[in-house]
């Protein structure tokens, strides 16, 4: 049975004729019948692999999809923090964010708590500048963490390491 045959007519048009004008896109493809691995090709031409846990039929060959959601959120936040610090003329030389998350016990198992811990390295970094950069990312710029904040309690911690 074709995928389009499984959906009512109103959805068939969307599946066969994508809506034009979306500024971001991604195509996810299942990699075969012997597991639960998927490859995602982004609109910018990059490929990311995903796989499921063995207890879910996967082979543990790549991150889980929700791990990539968490990683993407960390990347979004770290990007913002570094950019804000650079624009504030801070001599930042490194930034690492460690994320810890909890998910709901029942489906859809959304994130319910996420903690970000930033380790920012640099020469003479001002604590107020680091705190401000993290705050601006969390409250204004990081679309990923702002979206996840709709279902999860989000907290932040940070430390500065002199480089």
Where would I find each of the regions flagged by the language model?
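Extended beta-strand/beta-hairpin segments
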Residues: 3, 7, 11-71, 82-163
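Ribosome-associated translation termination/rescue signal centered on the conserved GGQ peptidyl-tRNA hydrolysis loop
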Residues: 78-80
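Alpha-helical metal-binding/catalytic segments enriched in His/Glu/Asp
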Residues: 73-76
